[in-house]
Amino acid sequence: MSEIRTGFLTMATIILICIGLTMTGTGLYYRKTVSKCIRETDGSFVVIGLLLLVIPQFALYAICCHSKRMFTIYIYAMIFVSIVLGGYSLKCFIYNTTFGIAKNPAEEKRTAKQLVGRLVPESKLAKVTECIIHNHDCNFNASQNSNVWRYCCAQPRGCGVTTMFGQPGEWSWKHQHVENHVPEECSYEYCLSCRGCQMSILKAIVHQWKYLSMFSYPALFLVCLSLAISRSIMDTFDEPDDYRGYYS
């Protein structure tokens, strides 16, 4: 019976390590590909990933050494991991259930003022829109064709013959922002304060937490399962530190 529990703990540990490796890689990938203006969960991915990559390995050492002391260290460390994961999972759940933004943000009936609050404060929304202008994100990220750049960087209606891009798909706000050759009806505030833009920013933030939940939920379940199994295995040890190097 002990061998079966040990086998389940080993499998759960290996899966957790794989999840940790994937999350760490995802966080580092986010830092290189996602604009810092809307980058929200890259640090969370790296932190959780490193915890899952390192701490579950103690279970393998404890199993190999048949050490009660190592299991004790592992259990306390995993309790800390479960608290961290529980906090992130709760935040993901709140984001996912609070913000149900339409697939096409421009068709969302609610206004940004109805959605901003403690989760996404109004100052955060203002900071993102300011960042888009001053970092010239329309030049850098428009090719990704995400909703944020589609609705925040697209030329507003009513601009007449004045264009904000040199050729289709190539934005030139950087040049016009520097020389200030944009007429009043085509000002940056017109586009950045529109419903589609603001909803796209909120949706981009929420989507990152939703993606994080795809990892945090199963990881939290496996951590709790590993804790239960390791606690039952440790109860079978008679000595505080029973190092044998094999199973008996």
From Swiss-Prot:
Record-level GO BP terms: auxin-activated signaling pathway
Primary location recorded for the protein, binned into one broad class: membrane
Extracellular side: 29-44, 91-208
Top-level taxonomic group: Eukaryota
Localization, UniProt: Membrane
Keywords carried by this UniProt record: Glycoprotein, Membrane, Transmembrane, Transmembrane helix
Cytoplasmic domain ranges by topology: 1-7, 66-69, 230-248
GO CC, alphabetical: membrane
Its job: May be involved in the regulation of cell differentiation.
This protein's name: Tetraspanin-16
UniProt source species: Arabidopsis thaliana
